[in-house]
Amino acid sequence: MNGNWIDIKTSDDTKFQGYLSVPDCGTGPGLIIGQEIFGVNKTMRQIADYFAEEGYVVLVPDMFWRLKERVELAYNEVDFKTAFGYFGKFNLDLAVEDISLSMDKLKTLDECTGGVGYMGFCLGGKLAYLTASKLEPEVAISFYGVGIPEML
């Protein structure tokens, strides 16, 4: 399974990117995957590729693009500090807009033949809660979403 990066256009014609992975059969329902605070790193891309192998058209948008494009951090002490630095500057409202744009982008792709769901990890898990409450995904799943109780 080989994914590639695609452009996602914003309302002001700015672009950000997301990692797209398509099943071998070429089509399937859509799935947005929300990244951890470590960016669209190897782990997030492997998860996308796994779900593509299961038949989904998967898009992992770069949620840190306004701070730095294509952040890719490892799970070590130095990168943890860097990740929390990005997290501290992160704008949740703009992120939900980016998820909406990502969902719209996925729906326009010929490969996406069904509805679009959202699944997020860590920061992406928090965004799953916001996506479910503000957008209309077919399903929203949060894995170890941070800070959700404080938003209730």
Where are these regions (language model features)?
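N-terminal cap/leader regions of alpha/beta-hydrolase-fold enzymes
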Residues: M1-L152
